[in-house]
Structure formats: structure tokens, C-alpha cells
């Protein structure tokens, strides 16, 4: 399965990335190589290989989840540049236009 520049353009558009023509050619080649490597891996016979769910024998080392009192909300809100209805207001980063 070969990856073409149209597929790379489509994925780049979904990620809101823009490439120059030279970059598009470079990334198209790199993506094609990656897809070919994954295809090679899928052809490996793993019939007698035991299933691996964890690479190591490490156990969960997270601490117990304990609720503690946080910083006063009113004090925190005094330090934000803009707020609205008790929330911190930030610039929009998601383009909701239809593309």
C-alpha cells in the first residue's frame, strides 16, 4: 500500500498543519516507508509466540489518591488576565469552520 501526497495533505489538514511542496514530498516518502515497515511486521509469523500484555514485571507504583484542600479559587482568579462566569477565558484554538 503506497501513501500518496493527497493522503498526507488530508492528514496534515486534519492536524491543522501546512507544508511546503518540498516538505510534502519528504513527508510523503517518510510516511510510505513507515507504512511499508508496518506491513512487514504484520507478515511476521507469531503463531508460537506467547501473548505479551506487559513488557516488564513492574507493578503499579502510584500513591493512594487522597483528596487535599487546594488553593482558594477567588485568589487564583485574581491572577488571570480574563475570566467569564467564574472560568478562565483563553483565546480560541479550535477552528470550527466546515472544511
From Swiss-Prot:
Can the keyword Metal-binding be found in this entry's annotation?
no
Gene3D superfamilies with a match to the protein in the record: Glu-tRNAGln amidotransferase C subunit, N-terminal domain
What are the UniProt keywords, alphabetically? ATP-binding, Ligase, Nucleotide-binding, Protein biosynthesis
Q: Which cysteines are joined by disulfide bonds?
A: none
- Alphabetized SUPFAM superfamilies for the sequence: Glu-tRNAGln amidotransferase C subunit
What family classification does the UniProt entry report for this protein? Belongs to the GatC family.
This protein's assembly is summarised as: Heterotrimer of A, B and C subunits.
Q: What is this protein called?
A: Aspartyl/glutamyl-tRNA(Asn/Gln) amidotransferase subunit C
Chain's gene name: gatC
